[in-house]
């Protein structure tokens, strides 16, 4: 292998902010932030969703912004659907 062309592989702490859980995973991601866990300093990255919080993996439904879009659509055009059903 050629020297000095591969990224540094190290243990990184990923913080799932939606459930406030920390994961120590090997990664090559670059970050300037650090965190100390169990007396050891690790590079630190925040994430919004992980396998522990994603609805597909948890089986739990979460409210999403698109539900507001559906409600807004129904409010605007729902009267046309009701008129067609009535006759």
Curated annotation (Swiss-Prot):
Under Gene3D superfamilies, the record lists: Ribosomal protein L31
Q: Name one Pfam family in it.
A: Ribosomal_L31
Asked whether the keyword Ribonucleoprotein is assigned, the reply is yes
Q: Where are the transmembrane segments?
A: none
Instruction: Recite the UniProt keywords alphabetically.
Output: Ribonucleoprotein, Ribosomal protein
Spell out the SUPFAM superfamilies in the cross-references.
L28p-like
Q: Which GO cellular component terms, listed alphabetically, does the Swiss-Prot or TrEMBL entry include?
A: ribonucleoprotein complex; ribosome
On whether Ribosomal protein is a keyword of this UniProt record, the answer is yes
Give the similarity note: Belongs to the bacterial ribosomal protein bL31 family. Type B subfamily.
Subunit structure as annotated in this protein's UniProt entry: Part of the 50S ribosomal subunit.
Q: Report what the protein is called.
A: Large ribosomal subunit protein bL31B-2/bL31B-3
State the organism of origin: Escherichia coli O157:H7
| Phylogenetic lineage | Bacteria, Pseudomonadati, Pseudomonadota, Gammaproteobacteria, Enterobacterales
């Amino acid at each position: 292998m050629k020297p000095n062309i591969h990224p540094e592989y190290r243990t990184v702490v990923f913080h799932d902010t939606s459930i406030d859980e920390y994961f120590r995973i090997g990664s090559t991601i670059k970050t300037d932030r650090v965190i100390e866990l169990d007396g050891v300093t690790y590079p630190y990255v925040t994430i919004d969703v992980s396998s522990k919080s994603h609805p597909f993996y948890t089986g739990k439904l979460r409210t999403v912004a698109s539900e507001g879009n559906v409600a807004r659509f129904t409010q605007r055009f729902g009267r046309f659907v009701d008129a067609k059903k009535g006759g």
